[in-house]
Amino acid sequence: MPLHQFQPHPGRNSSLTFAFASLVIHSLFRTDPSDWSKNNTSSYLDLSPLYGYNQVTQDQVRDKAQGKGLLYPDTFSEERLGFVPPAASALLVILSRNHNVRSQNFQIS
């Protein structure tokens, strides 16, 4: 078989399935480093890897100077993603860009 010939996954999964699963896991589980029996996240799937899980991390990704609800370009809040497949970070960049496009559309309407 040639090196670049497409071969579908036997279970018909996209490789992005696993990247999205990593984002879901990182949204739902943030163990407290001082007490491993505590989870420091909310019970919501809230895209905290993109937007931040507290005010300090939210302020690091939001461009408040413009006052338009934008995020800094191609940024996300989650520092733990260095240990997951790069596709998870790529998905967050796509979601960040989509957020900014939608924020700018709200400004126009």
Question: Where are the regions that the model predicts?
Answer:
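N-terminal accessory/cap region of cofactor-dependent oxidoreductases and related radical enzymes
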Residues: 1-106
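Structured binding elements
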Residues: 109
